[in-house]
Amino acid sequence: MTLLITGDSIVSAEAVWDHATMANRELAFKAGDVIKVLDASNKDWWWGQIDDEEGWFPASFVRLWVNQEDEVEEGPSDVQNGHLDPNSDCLCLGRPLQNRDQMRANVINEIMSTERHYIKHLKDICEGYLKQCRKRRDMFSDEQLKVIFGNIEDIYRFQMGFVRDLEKQYNNDDPHLSEIGPCFLEHQDGFWIYSEYCNNHLDACMELSKLMKDSRYQHFFEACRLLQQMIDIAIDGFLLTPVQKICKYPLQLAELLKYTAQDHSDYRYVAAALAVMRNVTQQINERKRRLENIDKIAQWQASVLDWEGEDILDRSSELIYTGEMAWIYQPYGRNQQRVFFLFDHQMVLCKKDLIRRDILYYKGRIDMDKYEVVDIEDGRDDDFNVSMKNAFKLHNKETEEIHLFFAKKLEEKIRWLRAFREERKMVQEDEKIGFEISENQKRQAAMTVRKVPKQKGVNSARSVPPSYPPPQDPLNHGQYLVPDGIAQSQVFEFTEPKRSQSPFWQNFSRYCEGIKKPNRSKRVSDYDDAGVDFCSGNILHSGCFFYHWGFPCCSTAGSLQFCI
């Protein structure tokens, strides 16, 4: 290492841990940053550079790159001619390796070394922290420990078996001949347990943050670290290790494939392992994103009026597709226009408000686990006795119930059919890895919705909970439905598009002017300007109380009264 630096070679290291510091002469960095090592004469503290910043940093916080690019002359202190000692936790660099086999040996040895080092970290977490926490029932409940540590013990057991198989495939005499690709393929299903841990990690950090406000917990965790003789890193740093580890596998396998000849017996296995691990990390990231978006689903549900039944988050975590279609539920039934929201496991049916088209009313849901999608050719359907175009069915095999849907265009029908296939695929993948939203995450989403301040103005109804009462006639109730700060003309322009008035309604309006205003309380004048023609969208004259089909009606913003 020293020979590389003194020989004007560039020695690069990758940060494994975050190093936050306020000291002037220390170098701050985050995990994943690349550091140029300038001085390694001290075994514990090295001098390095990131961009234009230089400073001291802990040597244990970084991992040297396997293959340094610059060449140096061989010296007496070279260790294993540039090989990484698999029995140590650090990389021993000597004379640079000049052929593919030697380069591959470097990568193999690094993988073995980091796996052994990682196993030690998992053991320290399970025995140094979790085991001690379970002894203190006065400080930790079972639920708290589940949130903080997640399924770390399952990961520890899995990694022990994985490393045992790696050891069997490792060729200690000629590391480049090792065939470790099959190990990743044999254990590919086991890596999915990281999904649960990664999804829970944010909750773990939040719970730890609350506990650390109490000095008792600070002292307890520090005592656990010292008792287990762990390096000087806080517990949240140790708990971050599995998240970092699962993201490192594709990088390591890509490096291994780079230095593996195509005629090597391990080449096709490494290539397949790389594809598998990339898929695992991609899916884990996708599920992490889904959990981060559950607050939006909870907020959407709160905006839907007249909600009934269980919450969306009780079964679903992703909105897959949404659109408006015509729908018939039973033979000879009436064609109804509905807005459909397809989630995993269920599809929610809503109806738009007649005036406020941005307001939705809950009208039911369909359990997608019980239905199959049936594509239908254009023509006439004998069961429903209707002509069909751009249609498809949802058929319940158990009850023989059928829902018939009509898309406006063929392209829209194709998108719906594709969305249904995606929904089934997502459900199957979630069942495979055991993905679900924890009760704690559901509570957090519900709390977030309650904390969102209700908006004022045109969109105020979108914040009203499902128990929103039916609209009331402002002439019979002493309250406004239109906020004082908004011009009513603006409100109605928003809710009803402008259109030319027919001669019938012009004559009708003149007829209304001749009708004597009913005798009401003195405060009626306060609400006279709230009247609106529900067909034309025009605001009526002050004091105009018009009649429709012989029955008095009054329409206001967001509250349309059909007195029929």
Curated annotation (Swiss-Prot):
Residues 318-425 form the PH domain. Residues 100-110 are annotated as: Interaction with GPHN. Its main location: cytoplasm. Acts as a guanine nucleotide exchange factor (GEF) for CDC42. Promotes formation of GPHN clusters. Residues 8-67 form the SH3 domain. GO terms for cellular component: cytosol; postsynaptic density. The modification Phosphoserine is found at S502. Residues 451-470 are annotated as: Disordered. One of its GO terms (molecular function) is guanyl-nucleotide exchange factor activity. Residues 103-287 form the DH domain. This is Rho guanine nucleotide exchange factor 9. InterPro entries: ARHGEF9_SH3, DBL_dom_sf, DH_dom, PH-like_dom_sf, PH_domain, SH3-like_dom_sf, SH3_domain, SOS1_NGEF_PH. It is found in: Cytoplasm; Postsynaptic density. SUPFAM superfamilies: DBL homology domain (DH-domain), PH domain-like, SH3-domain. It comes from the Eukaryota. It holds the Pfam family SH3_1. Keywords: Cytoplasm, Guanine-nucleotide releasing factor, Phosphoprotein, SH3 domain, Synapse. Interacts with GPHN.
